[in-house]
Curated annotation (Swiss-Prot):
Keyword terms: Aminoacyl-tRNA synthetase, ATP-binding, Cytoplasm, Ligase, Metal-binding, Nucleotide-binding, Protein biosynthesis, RNA-binding, tRNA-binding, Zinc
UniProt-listed GO biological process terms: alanyl-tRNA aminoacylation
Protein's organism: Methanobrevibacter smithii (strain ATCC 35061 / DSM 861 / OCM 144 / PS)
Molecular function via GO: alanine-tRNA ligase activity; aminoacyl-tRNA deacylase activity; ATP binding; tRNA binding; zinc ion binding
UniProt cross-references to InterPro entries, sorted A to Z: aa-tRNA-synth_II/BPL/LPL, Ala-tRNA-lgiase_IIc, Ala-tRNA-ligase_IIc_anticod-bd, Ala-tRNA-synth_IIc_core, Ala-tRNA-synth_IIc_N, Ala-tRNA_lgiase_arc, Ala-tRNA_ligase, DHHA1_dom
Biological function: Catalyzes the attachment of alanine to tRNA(Ala) in a two-step reaction: alanine is first activated by ATP to form Ala-AMP and then transferred to the acceptor end of tRNA(Ala). Also edits incorrectly charged Ser-tRNA(Ala) and Gly-tRNA(Ala) via its editing domain.
Ligase is among the record's keywords: yes
Name of the molecule in the record: Alanine--tRNA ligase
Entry annotated with the keyword NAD: no
Reaction catalysed by this enzyme: tRNA(Ala) + L-alanine + ATP = L-alanyl-tRNA(Ala) + AMP + diphosphate
EC number, UniProt record: 6.1.1.7
Length: 897
């Protein structure tokens, strides 16, 4: 037992319900946490006075500042700004992992205090139902980084501060329980105490001592971290005694939503429901209906009475919570999409629309978001700065959602049809999740489309399962490669213009089945940051060897040699190296141009622009930018123009090495536009007044050295990501000349001047379109005539009217004639072919009911033609190169009826 517990009068006890060890000042049978204890503060606040969320944030900050902690500003909730293993900040400690907790970087203050908005979607299905779960919550923390040289405080002082804070806000300390437990998250773990009062956990005090390894094992770390997490929303809630935390923390939003939806509230049922339902999570019960029934039984009312009161309010709570979460997500730079953090934002957004639909709200999501922003921006001015951006995304995403639902009907119907064909009567969960994952079709829409014809069971924790599959980033996992050589001296950082060098060969390293050379120093830039490596030659004892690739492994540059060369003879010798300078300067121009284009795009499109990837090339390069819609040609022109203005300003680049904490302190997380840069020291490329990034690539000395920048095209590479293809320097001149050449050649074909080309092309297209329509009309008339001429060729086979004919018609005509026969009841089965090896089959509903599978018939008939075929039960087509076998193919088709 810790000395501090004894000093403060806490006694070690064991919960008679759950068996957990806990500490309290008075004798108790239970540990103070749900489900062992009900919420005992609803209608009976636990503090001397009520606090709003923002008041409790201020009190928390002031209390810890008096106790010697330095308050710091919140971090973005998008953790990918500084780490590559998770997408979102799930706890305040995520802000300091891995760089601070590993000792590589100094903390911004020590000890520090922060109120950090955090997002957790692993229990999203509990939101609105338990009264306490939120997708986005504010974690108050006092954090300490203890080292051997500077050990500040550990368990005793952490517990004392917690005890004193709750006492300070008016909680009776005899109601506080410290439950002994274990915590892990973000790659670290350690023992902890969960601090509970009147049935709700208010804080977790974690003492991080271990790193969590990939294999699940733990490894002790030299730095000991005090990581506390106070649920500030819950503390505000317990101080007010409202039925739910939502009523306590965003009452103005909840009240406005109640007004818009005209939801009537039975406060007695709602309060008692919150007390009981709060003790149970969906994952604990497994079935929401069972949970509802238990609550209804406890209240002495019917299930219908409970649902009538609870469900509309739960939907309102969910909408209020989700719009708050979205405000932080979008303001901090997340672009909704179908991948990574964008997927999580879209999940929250579409759940919001779903519950608005349940309440039959006439308002748009943008209007509802406006209500949330009016409340939230009073306390977070940085969100106010992003208000227009947020509203643009919300409006666009709402349109996309409606489009998805329309398209979803046919996708779901096809999926159900396939399952029925396989003899299944219920949709598997993995298919239901895939319909949401791949197509954005929510489960309730699938249920609605399936109707009574097919069983679709949606688990109550569906969205929790979906979110859980997307919360961690596994795309950056790399295989480890051990190498035991001293760090290579990178000469290109000391003198960009150095083209030749002399070095000593330290050894030969085999990697990926190839032998590579290690030097003590090099001018060869190794591939990295989307920039290809330098190439060139080395001379050893008069022999010249080509270097076709260089890569860096653990700060050692490996030089790949072209051809089959005995490298062991080189070890210990001096070599003279020379790089391909034209390639180097071209790549450097493209790399510097990349920075200018990103800066220009941010200026033109908005501060949300973030580099999502890049690849530099010799003739053209590309950069991927996170953006919520297509970049228009007008915007592209503006970006290109601004980037070239930066070039003409001929600004000198400022390139320096900083410690990570110095760089972040000076420039923030926008440093990491090009990705997370590992290491304690980082190289910062600054174009004064325009852009600053952590970047290891080669760059020109002044922007004027880049030369012209030509944007070639843009494309949508994935949802939420726009790719800009561009060229710089002489490569840009080549691109411009090539476009001019194509323009002149096109003008020559039409025999018009260049400026007349668009008008001429438009006229030719209009004429072609009109002629095509006329041709299609004539083909339709011909098909009608041919159909009439074939009316007498109907024969009867097994009670079905059948037409078989080899005629002179193209594929589309064959299809039209065949379907016209079956649609107008002139025939049940139509089999037609032409002399080009095309075969078509059509079947009426009467034929299908009789067991005719025209798609299988055509597939077999097309085999005779040396090809294949298939299609639907109503219409199938096939083709093959053996045109001379068409009569045989049609006869085989007839035999299969």
């Amino acid at each position: 037992m810790l000395e501090i517990f004894d000093k403060l009068g806490y006694k070690k006890q064991k919960c008679k319900t759950c068996g957990h060890e806990f500490y309290a000042q008075v004798d108790r049978d239970t540990c103070g946490d749900a489900p062992c204890d009900e919420y005992e503060f609803i209608g009976n606040p636990a503090t001397d006075k009520p606090y709003t969320l923002y008041e409790i944030q201020q009190v928390f900050r002031e209390f810890l500042e008096k106790e010697g902690h330095t308050p710091i500003k919140r971090y973005p909730i998008l953790a990918k700004r500084w780490r590559d293993d998770v997408f979102l900040v799930g706890a305040s400690i995520f802000c300091f992992q891995p760089w601070v907790t590993s000792g590589m970087v100094k903390p911004p203050a020590n000890p520090l205090e922060i109120e950090q908005p955090s997002v957790r979607l692993n229990d999203v299905d509990n939101v609105g139902r338990t009264g306490r779960h939120m997708t986005c919550f504010t974690m108050g923390s006092h954090t300490v980084i203890n080292t051997e040289e500077n050990f500040i405080y550990w368990e005793d002082e952490t517990i004392r501060l917690c005890h004193e804070f709750f006492k300070y806000i008016g909680i009776n300390t005899e109601e506080i329980c410290f439950i002994k437990s274990w915590w892990s998250g973000g790659g670290n773990e350690g023992p902890c105490y969960e601090v509970c009062v009147r049935g709700v956990e208010l804080a977790t005090l974690v003492f991080i001592q271990y790193k969590t390894l990939d294999n699940g094992e733990k490894e002790e770390i030299p730095i000991k971290v005090v990581d506390t997490g106070y649920g500030l929303e819950r503390i505000a809630w317990i101080s007010q005694g409202t039925p739910t935390a939502y009523d306590a923390c965003f009452a103005p939003v909840v009240d406005k939503l109640k007004e818009l939806t005209d939801v009537k509230v039975n406060t007695d049922i709602l309060a008692r429901n919150a007390q009981i339902a709060g003790m149970m999570d969906i994952e604990d019960i497994g079935d929401i209906k069972e949970l509802r029934q238990q609550v209804a039984n406890s209240l002495g009312i019917t299930l219908d009475e409970l649902l009538e009161s609870a469900e509309p309010m739960e939907a309102i709570y969910i909408i209020a919570d989700h719009t708050r979460c979205l405000a932080f997500m979008l303001a901090d730079g997340i672009i909704p999409s179908n991948v990574k953090e964008g997927y999580l934002a879209r999940l929250v957004l579409r759940r919001t629309i779903r519950f608005m639909k349940e309440l039959n709200m006439k308002e748009s999501l943008a209007e509802v978001m406006g209500i949330q922003l009016e409340f939230l921006t009073k306390f977070y001015p940085e969100i106010k700065d992003s208000e227009d951006h947020i509203m643009n995304i919300i409006s666009l995403e709402e349109e996309r959602y409606q489009s998805t639902i329309k398209k979803g009907t046919s996708i779901v119907k096809r999926s159900i049809k396939r399952l029925k064909k396989e003899g299944k009567t219920e949709m598997p969960l993995d298919m239901l999740m895939d319909l949401y994952d791949a197509h954005g079709i929510p489960p309730e829409t699938v249920v609605e489309i399936a109707g009574d014809n097919f069983t679709v069971n949606v688990p109550d924790n569906f969205f929790t399962l979906v979110a859980g599959a997307h919360e961690k980033d596994t795309s950056n996992k790399k295989e480890s490669f051990e190498i035991d050589y001293p760090e290579t001296d990178l000469l290109f950082y000391k003198d960009f213009n150095q083209k030749e060098f002399e070095a000593e060969v330290l050894g030969v390293v085999e990697k990926d089945g190839k032998n590579t050379l290690v030097f003590d120093k090099t001018v060869f830039y190794p591939e990295g940051g989307g920039q290809p490596s330098d190439v060139g030659t080395i001379s050893v004892d008069g022999a010249v060897v080509n270097i076709n690739y260089a890569e860096k492994v653990n700060n050692v540059v490996l030089h790949h040699v072209d051809g089959d060369v005995d490298l062991d003879n080189f070890v210990g010798k001096k070599v003279e190296g020379k790089i391909d300078w034209n390639r180097r300067i071209t790549l450097a121009r493209h790399h510097s141009a990349t920075h200018l284009i990103v800066a220009a795009a941010r200026k033109i499109l908005g501060e949300h622009i973030w580099q999502a990837g890049a690849q530099k090339g010799v003739s053209r390069s590309r950069i991927d930018l996170s953006h919520y819609k297509r970049i228009s040609q007008e915007e592209l022109n503006e970006i290109e123009k601004l980037a070239n203005e930066y070039v003409m300003d001929n600004i000198e680049l400022d390139i320096k090495f900083y410690t990570r904490d110095e760089a972040e302190s000076l420039y923030g997380f926008k440093l990491y536009q090009g990705g997370i840069v590992p290491g304690k020291s980082i190289r910062v490329v600054k174009i004064p007044g325009i852009d600053v990034q952590a970047c290891a690539g080669t760059h020109v000395l002044r922007t004027g050295d880049i030369g012209p920048i030509k944007i070639n095209k843009t494309e949508r590479v994935q949802d939420g990501v726009e790719r800009i293809d561009f060229s710089a320097g002489t490569a840009a001149v080549d691109s411009i000349q090539n476009e001019n050449k194509l323009l002149r050649e096109s003008s020559g074909i039409f025999k018009v001047d260049d400026d007349q080309l668009p008008k001429t092309c438009d006229r030719f297209f209009s004429e072609w379109k009109a002629q095509k329509n006329e041709i299609d009309k004539l083909k339709s008339e011909i098909a009608s005539l041919k159909m009439n001429s074939l009316a007498d060729d109907v024969t009867e086979i097994n009670g079905l009217k059948v037409v078989k004919q080899l005629i002179d018609a193209d594929f589309k005509e064959l299809q039209k004639i065949a379907t016209d026969f079956t649609d107008n009841d002139k025939a049940d089965v139509v089999l037609m072919g032409n002399n080009d090896g095309k075969i078509v089959g059509a079947a009426s509903q009467n034929a299908i009911d009789a067991g005719i599978k025209v798609n299988e018939i055509i597939k077999k008939a097309a085999g005779v033609l040396g090809g294949g075929g298939g299609g639907r039960l109503t219409l199938a087509q096939g083709a093959g190169p053996k045109c001379e076998n068409m009569n045989e193919a049609l006869n085989i088709a007839i035999d299969l009826i």
